[in-house]
Amino acid sequence: MLLDEKVTENEIEGMVRLFLENVKSGIWRSQGWPAVWTDYAVSKLALNGHSKIMAKLFKGRELSVNCFCPGFTQTSMTGGKGKYTSQAAAEVATCIVLLPPEKLLTGKFYVGSTPGVYSNHLHCLVVHEKMRRAKT
């Protein structure tokens, strides 16, 4: 779904409705939905799809719409487990948001568990590294 550049709101909402129907019917496992954090994963799929649509809608209006996944982060959702602190995740998210407009893409999904996978934004990685070093 997310690879389809022409995905529509109706298609996203249809996917969510199908998931909910499958859950109510008790057949969601046999229908191939994610086995781990199922509802979370489906909601993030919908969020990413809507973000892509919004990015197209606001294109040319000096507004970027993106999603960001910091990776396995220590939060209440993970029971305090995770590879990264919420502070570290917030620093990278802030870095992405503060990229100059000409370097910040729109309609993208930023995945980050280690520096280097943030959509090749070298500027962001350099700033993040400087922030990390300043704390030590």
Regions found by a protein language model. Give the residues of each.
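Catalytic loop of short-chain dehydrogenase/reductase
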Residues: 1-59, 69, 80
